[in-house]
């Protein structure tokens, strides 16, 4: 099956779009009429450019408001079509998309509509061209694929077929299952788009909020599976109208587009193998299976000598012990429970380059995987960029891929026997690593540019088969923050992704500090929040002070006794409870160098969230702390 994308899905000029589409690895392209109208070359020039780039022009679109027009306009519309046919022949494509009429005065008699399409198809047949008819979700008389198919069937022309678009069906809660019963040869083209699930006018939804497969909330595998079951083996194409995409970097967005199609094919293959195993799936993308990801092995910070010492002191106050020094590099290992933190101040290293670009920051995350080789091959299949660093004497090579911000994701196999990566690379000691009782990394929250959220979600979904939670919009004292978390299938790796379009929010300040994406905060799990925080206070950890009014509100919301509320307030512990009775206790440090901070948390009774209800008070408290405002001592 050929993979395609509509030029309207990308930013830039038509040549820039085509070059990006080819570089990403697409087979073909849909030429959107406005892109052609705004290009200063001829259709033949576009044809030559596509040929030079190895792209096939699979479709020209759209041809609007044709069938069911008032009878006095039919002849003029047919002449209009002839001019578009001229253009198509210059472009070298044989298929045009005709979308259902949206005019207020469009007629609705099925026999008349079918006859109009018949006349159009007969004219196209003279030139060896094909007509693909698509039902727009906001079409005046035709807005479902079933209605469109009825007209195509009635018109009964060999060169007239159906064009299917996932958005137009799923936005109306349509049922695509019946597509499996259509003759596959009468489906001429399939367009795919995802979208967040919104309650709004369908036209506005389509024009502004479509996104690539895997970035929204539609069941696209459930849509594509019956298409494949019908016998269709034609192009799969992306048609995405999105305000953010119109400003996104053209080449990076094209790469995202191809990755999203591959991801959709994989998920459709899995769907078919579960539901209808007799359907052939050989033409659908089949990468190596995702390797089980069951935790974070270590987090690596890029620092220099001075900031490395300062961060090391911070972490030691949080209960981390210096557990080792690298055998040949200026790299330290700090440990507490199953948490391993690496401070890398080695000159002329990857970390040094990252530090020069971003300052003190998280430059690498090591994921625990069952099969590192398989995980790396899957990442390659999805367009991930492998990384190989310079190895010192007797140093173990760890496979890695670059994340979207240029940081590294190491792929570590956790062995129960033999020498660990730390034994190979570090001179370790017998330091007590029990610390405050912190046990593991609970989650790592990232601050991203506003246009980057969908790309990061797709990256983790495709390369690592992570799931994604729904978006949550949270108030900051200076604007709004949007958060969406991705997580490994077993839930042991959680990555809340945060964006803000407002200039003065905490997320925006992080982006300014890092000169790009960066870690927002790191959360550590513990078994006893009050014992851990008591030790942290005693060690001099700068904990974020929470306004006392917050605890008055807790008293109104929950049936807590005064003694327990006083304990929460004394230790600055925030509290949340979910609908199932799960509980979260968490406390935050003040930021390190006004960049990232740490969270200590305890989950009880299956609580799986991140304390969204407490984000506003935490952000307000941080704003107060920046201004030097301290609460009255208890």
UniProtKB/Swiss-Prot annotation:
Q: Name its pathway.
A: Aromatic compound metabolism; 3,4-dihydroxybenzoate biosynthesis
EC number(s) on record?
4.2.1.118
The answer, when asked if Hydrolase is one of the entry's keywords, is no
Function of the protein: Catalyzes the conversion of 3-dehydroshikimate to protocatechuate (3,4-dihydroxybenzoate), a common intermediate of quinate and shikimate degradation pathways. Is required for growth on either quinate or shikimate as a sole carbon source.
Annotated HAMAP family: DSD
Stored NCBIfam families: DhshikDhtase_QuiC
Which family is annotated?
Belongs to the bacterial two-domain DSD family.
Q: What is this protein called?
A: 3-dehydroshikimate dehydratase
